[in-house]
Amino acid sequence: VTGLLLDTNVISMFAPTKVVQNKAFADWLEERETHEGVFLSAVTIHEIVKGAELLRARGATAKAKLVDAFLQELMTHYEDRILALDAEAGVEAGRLEAKAVAAGSAPGAADAMIAGIASRHALTIVTLNLKHFQAFDVPLMSPEEILP
């Protein structure tokens, strides 16, 4: 497996609750999907569900329903390109997170798991938060780097 692993914040750029969506980046991403692999992680699914449930808990049920529908579209679109945290990715995530913590960083388990999945599958993480992933020493790119 080679290609790109989209971080949750990149997928969130296209959520129906966002006011501004980046059409140029969406076009770039669509082109990548035809020529190389573009993947999501199960961690991203978790984070989106968590976000929807927190909206619901705060009484923002209409917004939560939009996020639910968005999630269903994502899961259909990326159906066989949603990568799980299997045992090998879990081991890699643990190693990467421990190395980052030992170096004085506090990356968080979700980002460590995304990095572990990316490392396990030799993918480049596309993220808006490069800083969150730099301690993991995995290939990264930002939408801002990709487009002028």
Q: Each predicted region: which residue ranges?
A:
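A generic structural signal for short hydrophobic patches within well-formed alpha-helices
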Residues: 11, 45-48, 90, 133
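Acidic, PIN/NYN-like endoribonuclease modules and their adjacent C-terminal/linker elements
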Residues: 3, 115-148
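Short, flexible helix/strand-to-coil boundary loops that buttress conserved ligand/catalytic motifs
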Residues: 15-18, 52, 97, 137
